[in-house]
Amino acid sequence: MHDLPDTDFTQRFIFDESDVRGELVALERSYAEVLAKHPYPEPVAQLLGELMAAAALLVGTLKFDGLLILQARSSGAVPLLMVECSSERELRGIARYDETLITPDAGLQDLMPDGSLALTVDPHKGKRYQGIVALDGVDLSESLSNYFVMSEQLGTRFWLKADGHRARGLLLQQLPAAQITDPEERDASWEHVITLASTLTAEEMLGLDNQTILHRLYHEDPVRLFDAQPICFRCSCSRERSANALVSLGLEDAQQLVIEHNGSIEIDCQFCNERYLFDATDVAQLFAGGGVDSPSDTRH
């Protein structure tokens, strides 16, 4: 039995007799914290939870030091879904929506018709990478799986579920041939594991622990489950970042903004709703090189 982090974690597993690895993710507290920042309609909250689960799974598969960003855009009721997950497994997310266009049973294609999905890896060192694919699957799981098909990488499949309280995800990925080198046997092995994964119901994914899920799916296959890695919600906004945005405007424009906004500038974080206030004294201190050590006001 593995000691698990409280509610939010990823957990890797591998098949001993085939070239396939997997990753499971469970999100509760971080999902709740994201939803607490914005009163999303249920279909939007579900989509955002699925995208959060996907980002956490992807960070588990990539070896990098930096930030992974998943961004879905459309001209429909949900013009934007965006999730960021750092290599330290710190997660945040946001959605934009038009509530008048959302029905209770709306799915991905109802909410985001003709959409696109961008995956960006922004390392602290090295070159930024971005790939874009049409959001043409029946759900986010299929759309993300299609992304990896289009990018001609190793076979990768996603299963994502969220219900407004918890978000769960399963990723399966082919590894380079080692255990099985015959191409036909390799294809059959891959088809075997994804066919079994596709029998997993939403109720099972959202309600069962990882060991039970793996036993139900693969009790005839030798599978090794590794230690869990914790995930948490954390927003990267700060008063310092907001101050840097003001400095980039230049002194004259920053002072003019203070005047236009009745003596203080409010900078709101779109992710967590943190609000940073800067008055004329703060602005003068910034441009005099005094830094941001003495905030006039910062509030939620």
From Swiss-Prot:
PTM remark: Under oxidizing conditions two disulfide bonds are formed involving the reactive cysteines. Under reducing conditions zinc is bound to the reactive cysteines and the protein is inactive.
CDD domains named in the record: Hsp33 (cd00498)
Entry keyword annotation includes Cytoplasm: yes
InterPro entries for the chain: Heat_shock_Hsp33, Heat_shock_Hsp33_C, Heat_shock_Hsp33_N, Hsp33_helix_hairpin_bin_dom_sf
Disulphide bridges, residue numbers: C235-C237, C269-C272
Assigned keywords, A-Z: Chaperone, Cytoplasm, Disulfide bond, Redox-active center, Zinc
Record's subcellular location: Cytoplasm
Any single GO CC term annotated in Swiss-Prot or TrEMBL for this entry: cytoplasm
Gene Ontology BP annotations: protein refolding
A GO molecular-function descriptor: unfolded protein binding
Pfam families assigned: HSP33
Top-level taxon of origin: Bacteria
NCBIfam families per record: PRK00114.1
Protein task: Redox regulated molecular chaperone. Protects both thermally unfolding and oxidatively damaged proteins from irreversible aggregation. Plays an important role in the bacterial defense system toward oxidative stress.
HAMAP family: HslO (MF_00117)
Family the entry assigns: Belongs to the HSP33 family.
Name the record gives this protein: 33 kDa chaperonin
